[in-house]
Structures are given as structure tokens and as C-alpha cells.
């Protein structure tokens, strides 16, 4: 089974994604960013952003950092992922509806963006893969 999944992932191309799936992904992404912007006003977001700025500083030897959204601060990849994910989750209005189980976009999207930002890789096709 794992061989089939691995083969599928290795052979899959961006061009194989149906337009409706891309459109839905982009709509969900915009929704998630809107939730993140609104959620910056929650107490949880303020606490976690302060925590990440204090304990997840970027490594000055590597020059690699990622941003805390709507804040202007840079931290390391883990700090950006943590701050942005928890900010989104603090409002609990993401992933389309409250009945959605798991809220996969809450952690996945901030993690992908933090990694892409740290690697200075801003390709939208890579983002959607």
C-alpha cells in the first residue's frame, strides 16, 4: 500500500489537479488568512505571539526567519508556525465550518508558509502541492 501512495505522490503533477479543486483551495486559503487577521485580537493570540518572540528567536548564524502574521515580528520557523497556527485556532472560525473535524488548515498552512518563507521559495505551485 505504501508503495502505491509513494508512487502517486512522486508522479503527481500540479497540472493534474482539477481547476475546481484549485479554486476551492484558494478560497479556503483566503478564508484562513481572514480568520488569522481577525484572530490577532484574541487574548490567546496576544499571549502566544509574545511567547514566540521571547523563546523562538531566529538563528542569527543562519539568517533564516519566518514572520508572525499581521505583527511585523520575525522568529524561527517553529515559532512562526506555532504563533500563526494558534492565532487561527483561537477564533475557531476556520476550515469552512465548525463541524469540520480536525481543522487541518490551522496547522498545515502556517507551517508550509513558514518553511517557504525561510527558504525564500514563493512558488504558488509548490505551495499547493
Spell out what each predicted region is.
Residues 1-129:
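N-terminal core-entry segment
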Amino acid at each position: 500500500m505504501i508503495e502505491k501512495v509513494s508512487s502517486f505522490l512522486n508522479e503527481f503533477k500540479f497540472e493534474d489537479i482539477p481547476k475546481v479543486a484549485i479554486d476551492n483551495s484558494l478560497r479556503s486559503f483566503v478564508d484562513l488568512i481572514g480568520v488569522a487577521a481577525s484572530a490577532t485580537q484574541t487574548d490567546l493570540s496576544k499571549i502566544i505571539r509574545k511567547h514566540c518572540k521571547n523563546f523562538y528567536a531566529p538563528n542569527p548564524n543562519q539568517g533564516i526567519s519566518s514572520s508572525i502574521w499581521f505583527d511585523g515580528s520575525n522568529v524561527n520557523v517553529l515559532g512562526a508556525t506555532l504563533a500563526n497556527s494558534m492565532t487561527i485556532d483561537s477564533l475557531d472560525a476556520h476550515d469552512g465550518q465548525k463541524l469540520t473535524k480536525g481543522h487541518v488548515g490551522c496547522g498545515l498552512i502556517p507551517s508550509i508558509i513558514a518553511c517557504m518563507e525561510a527558504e525564500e521559495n514563493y512558488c504558488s505551485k509548490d505551495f499547493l502541492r
